[in-house]
Every structure is written in structure tokens, then in C-alpha cells.
From Swiss-Prot:
Residues 174-232 form a coiled coil. Keywords: Coiled coil. This is Clathrin heavy chain linker domain-containing protein 1. The keyword Cytoplasm does not apply. The lineage of its organism: Eukaryota, Metazoa, Chordata, Craniata, Vertebrata. It comes from Macaca fascicularis. InterPro entries: ARM-type_fold (IPR016024), Clathrin_H-chain_linker (IPR012331), CLHC1 (IPR017212), TSNAXIP1_N (IPR032755). Pfam families: Clathrin_H_link (PF13838), TSNAXIP1_N (PF15739). Transmembrane segments: none annotated.
Amino acid sequence: MSVHQIRKRAVLPPIICRSDKEFLESMQRYIITETERLGYNEEGPADEYYIIYRNVFDKVIEHVTAYKSILTSIKKEYDAFIETIKKGRRTAFCLHGKLKGLAAEPTALVYHRKRTIQLEAKMRIIENNSSKIQSQIDQIKQSRAAYDTKEVKYCTFSKDPSKPIPGMTLQESMNLDALTKYMKHLEDKYAEIKQAMLIKYVPAQRKSDLDEEMIVLLKRRDVAENLNRKLQFCHQRLQIISQALTSWVKSDMSSPFQDFVEQIQKTKYLQGDQGIVEELMEDDPHRAKEAEIMLHYIERFNELISLGEYEKAACYAANSPRRILRNIGTMNTFKAVGKIRGKPLPLLLFFEALFITSHAFRCPVDAALTLEGIKCGLSEKRLDLVINWVTQQRLTFSEEAGDVICDYGEQDTYNKAKCLALAQIIYSECGLHKKAILCLCKQGQTHRVMEYIQQFKDFTTDDLLQLLMSCPQIELIQCLTKELNEKQTSLSFGLAILHLFSIDKKKIGIKLLQEINKGGIDAVESLMINDSFCSTERWQEVANICSQNGFDKLSNDIMSILRSQAAVTEISEEDDAVNLMEHVFW
């Protein structure tokens, strides 16, 4: 049979086995089912269709055996081709977006410029309107001020025409000649008053200038008086030396010159120093007018109070000569004024001026005024002023002042630390070391507490236990019961534990026992050996407390150490008759 004949013979389709046929039908059904489940037609999203056919391709590869490697290679190329298409689409989408952005930039720039022009025009309109409104407001203010001035000028002195004219009867007020004569009298009186104002009176500003000048002159006078006293004292000493030298020269100069000086000095003392001073001061012109000046100063102060010039009055009183107005009476004057709405408290103004000028006087502000000033500042919520007064000015502190600041700190918790620091300064200045150290404890400054205790060594055990009652802190107790620089402890640990449990501070005591329990028996033994204040009976009480609160090991350690100490007997060096081996032979 030729080749041509073979090619002309009809080619039969391959015979498909039953299993392959069922597999192909199942794949066809799977494709139809998944496509319908997506709800899209044939032109739907390519990604979903790609997933469906990829799954079918995988199942076909799993089903066949002879062509599995070929189909796997085809599928790999197919997946790579699909991924390349997706990547190209994403790149095209990004480039399309950038292209649209670049195309829209000129338009956006035009819109922004247009919007800028619109906003600038709107700002100019608003500024013009604002300037018009401001000019209208200024005009209204000017018109109102002019109206008020006119009202004061014309309405204040207006009188009811129906009322009778003072100094004229009803018939005279109806007579034109009498009215003309009375008007002439009033005009003459007005001219006289106006002339008197020009001659007899000066402006109030001139009065204040004179007051300031007088204050400066009074200060200069005080300086001159101090210098004058020093010169008088020097003159008196030179006079004594001169008289002694004259007497010594007239004598035979056998006696020492020092004896003549002492004799002349005793003679002067018998005559009286006050008489010498008065003799030397009798020509002082300021002494005669001192009482008059002080009286004028007090009158001026009262005048300022009556005029309501409380700030000037406060400065005037604070700078008064010889401190005549720096007293409780002046304080009561300001206190009687009370509060004025919209203005500072006059009493606070007085204390401000009083404390600020405290350095200008030899003596500091007394304790009573200091206490009242601190109370006034705290009542007005001016802790800043009180801080400045206490730290910068010359005041006389007292225990009451520190207590007032502490009480204020308890009410104002935000400023409690500042108040405790101020109170500690005051207590330290007054020598109230117990209260000063309590303030340090409340601030949590344990190291400063220990430094304070070492500096002032007059703290007894009762004082320290009282401190623990007021401020039970674990860190403080540990520092007090610890040796510092090989020195004896400030407080007994055992006494501290017993004291805490006796004053219902059980929690603090338990925490201390927990801390000491962590150190083991060596720490307990070291603590007991170095504790010379607590007796054996006291340590037995501590052991009982430990046992009652669940610290059995610590209790046993304490009792063991007590037994070991009881077995040791100290032999003095003087007792030579003691035989250490005596018990062996008996």
C-alpha cells in the first residue's frame, strides 16, 4: 500500500475511555458552575476566570500521567504570561494616573492663582471694613467723652429754678435790681476765689513731689544724725584723754597715765553721759522740730487714707522716720478699710511695702507684724509673695508663723511641698529642730533628715519615736537604725518595731520585718549586736511579734542569737583568779 493511499484513508477519532470521559464532563460542569456562581457573563473580570481555568488546568495535570511534565511546563509558561500581562496592566494604570496628574497641573495652578486673587481681594475688603468700624468706634468714644464732659460741666452745678435763691427772700428774687446786685456780688466772690486759687493753693502733684523730697531729706538727716553720734562719741573720748593728759603733766608723772584716764572716765560717768550728750546736742536745730515733723508725717498719712490713696499711704507708712508708722496700729488702720472691689487689698499693700523696705532699717520687722503679714498673704492666695518675704527680707520669725504656713499647705495640696520648705526655714531659724525635721520628713528628704540629726545631736530616743509616729516611713526607719561611718545607730530597730506595733502602724512594721528577713540570720545578728538600746526582754517581745505575724524563721533566728549571747560571759581583765578550765576537773 502506497503512502498516498494511506493518507487518503479516513482517520478515526481516538477512543476515549470511560474514566477520561467522566473526568472531562466533571471539568466542564465545574467551569459552568463556578462561572455562574461569579454572576458574570463571558466578558466578566479576567482575574476570576483565570483562577477558574487555572484550577481546571491543575486538575487535568493531576489526572493525566503520560503528559504530566509537558502540561506542567505549559502551565508554568501560561502563569508567567498571565503575570506579565497583570504587571503590564498595573504599570499602565500607574502611568495613566501620573499622566492625568501631569495633565491637570496647569489647570490646578490656574485655579490656585485665581483663588489667591479672590482671597487677597476679600482681605482688602475686610481690612477696609475693619478700618471703617474702628474709625466709627473712635468717633463714638470721642462723642461720648465730650458728652460726659459737657454733662459734668452743665449738669453738676445746675440747680432747680423752682427752689429759692440762698440769701434772698421771695420778694427780692422777683426784683430785677436785687437780682442784678446779687449777681454782681457772686461775680466778685468768684473772681476772689479764682485769685485765691492762683495765690494760696498749688496742684496736688506738687504736694506729692514735696512729700518725696521730704522723704529723701529725712533719710539724709538720719544718716547725718548717725554720723553726728559717732563724732560726738569720738569727741567725748578725746576730751577724756585730753583732760587726763593735762592732769598727768601737771602732776609729778609718778603714777601711770592709765590711772589718770580711768579716774577722769569715772568722773564723767558720775556726771552722767546723758547730760554730756544733751550738752553737745543742745545746738542741734533738728531736735526742736522733730516732734513737729513727725506730727506732720502722721497727718499726711491720715490724709492719704481719707483720700483713698492706699498704695501711697502704704509706702508712706513703710518709709516713716524712726518707724513711727511701722506698727500694729497702722496695720489695724489698713485692716479696717477692708476689701475694695476691683483693687488690691489695702492691708496687703501695707505689708508689701513694709517687708520690701525691711533692709533699709537696722532692726527687722517684729514677730507680730511678720505673722500678720504671712496670714494676709496666704488669705489672698499670694504664696509667691510669702516665699519672697521669707527668703529675701529681714523678718522676725516665730513658731506661729511656721504653723500657719503648714496649715495652708495641708489645705492647698498643690503647693504643699513649697509650704513645707518655707515652714522648715522658719522652724530652723527659731531653733525648733523637731518641727523642722518633721517638715523634711514630710517632703521625703530622708538624707537631709539624717544630716540634720547629725548636725544637732540633741535628739533623744523619745523624739525620734515621736517622729516615727507623725511620719512613719520605711526608708526613714532604715536610715535611723543603720550605722553611719562606724557610729552608733540613731534609733534601736527593736524599739522601732515595738513602737510601730503599739501605735497601730502594723503594716509598716510588717514591711520592716520582711526587709530584715531577706538578709538572713547574719543580717539579724549584726543588727542585734549593734543595737545597744534594746534589752533582751525587748528582743523577746520582737520575736513574739514576728511569730504572731507569720515570721517564724525570723523569730527563731532572734531567739537563737539571744541564747548564744546568754551563753557568753565576759571576763574582766582584772579578774586573775578565774580558772578557765575549772569545770573540766569537777
